[in-house]
């Protein structure tokens, strides 16, 4: 994995951990987020509002990168897979669920398509079922 990939991915997850001003450096303006969160606008502007919403729902929001799989070609373009754990305390409403004050952890798997040093598309999957269990909104057994 090249340093540029490490820097790009590190900056992205620093941005989603509460510094949306960093998005301009890593996402194209017309970035595709697949799937969009209900109500999310497309593009980099939609990512900004999503990050702001997550910041209202979680205090201490932090994405910890656990693994990066760089499958780009020699030209630097292609896919990068990232596995993270998202930590935060549920202090604001999310998905219609009132704040619980509980510390939570969600695992994510993201696949970023990189073209010319910027992310043009992201496919993502979060383990929201475990989050619902952690905040007491879904049975854990």
Q: Where is each model-derived feature located?
A:
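C-terminal and inter-domain tail/linker signature
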Residues: 1-141
